[in-house]
């Protein structure tokens, strides 16, 4: 089954388009997980326990796992999320060529261990850099299209000789690369007008829409324009997983209050987004 079919099933089951970003910043982990063998894995496990009823997907960011214990934590996290029947989108933003790209793409192969169901990629090096990902037809490939960070406009707004902006060209290319029906686009929620414009350019490609949580993006626009035939994801990372930091300032040796707050935050975002579905 293709990734977007699996995602559609999960969206229907959870009645949710919420992607929960699993970015376990070591400096912000609660005391209740610090004595564990793998603190990041212990943290993610408890976040998943608290949020899985409201999650359409989990999105671990590879930068928080790129050390030996981190990769172990990531493998455990992927396996545990799958045990809850929630797909995993690895936010790695890979972009390289040849053997390096093929090596990066192995994170999508189940014979290499717990495999991510989808991945984010950087299209700057062109199609051949993405081909090892695209050819895995059952895995999702989310191409960076229009990002929500302020500096994104430095390159993405550049006007080409054709008259289109660079990000618009990337969007068109992503559509061309979608021969296996496994391509999505990363499109930030901080500019609703651009989100609408990009949806008009590619009516059938699901979006991963970051920026609705801590970055203050537009939830209504994220849902209205981010979904293709009801399929798409709206991500919140820090706004969910660290929602309990205030609760943790009180005596909470077990961490129960911290993780309960994460669950409540995921539920609230689901309800907020569902108003516009």
UniProtKB/Swiss-Prot annotation:
<keyword id="KW-0210">Decarboxylase</keyword>
<dbReference type="GO" id="GO:0004590">
    <property type="term" value="F:orotidine-5'-phosphate decarboxylase activity"/>
</dbReference>
<dbReference type="InterPro" id="IPR013785">
    <property type="entry name" value="Aldolase_TIM"/>
</dbReference>
<comment type="pathway">
    <text>Pyrimidine metabolism; UMP biosynthesis via de novo pathway; UMP from orotate: step 2/2.</text>
</comment>
<dbReference type="InterPro" id="IPR011995">
    <property type="entry name" value="OMPdecase_type-2"/>
</dbReference>
<dbReference type="InterPro" id="IPR001754">
    <property type="entry name" value="OMPdeCOase_dom"/>
</dbReference>
<dbReference type="GO" id="GO:0044205">
    <property type="term" value="P:'de novo' UMP biosynthetic process"/>
</dbReference>
<dbReference type="InterPro" id="IPR011060">
    <property type="entry name" value="RibuloseP-bd_barrel"/>
</dbReference>
<keyword id="KW-0665">Pyrimidine biosynthesis</keyword>
<feature type="active site" description="Proton donor">
    <location>
        <position position="93"/>
    </location>
</feature>
<comment type="similarity">
    <text>Belongs to the OMP decarboxylase family. Type 2 subfamily.</text>
</comment>
<dbReference type="InterPro" id="IPR018089">
    <property type="entry name" value="OMPdecase_AS"/>
</dbReference>
<keyword id="KW-0456">Lyase</keyword>
<dbReference type="GO" id="GO:0006207">
    <property type="term" value="P:'de novo' pyrimidine nucleobase biosynthetic process"/>
</dbReference>
<dbReference type="Pfam" id="PF00215">
    <property type="entry name" value="OMPdecase"/>
</dbReference>
<protein>
    <recommendedName>
        <fullName>Orotidine 5'-phosphate decarboxylase</fullName>
        <ecNumber>4.1.1.23</ecNumber>
    </recommendedName>
</protein>
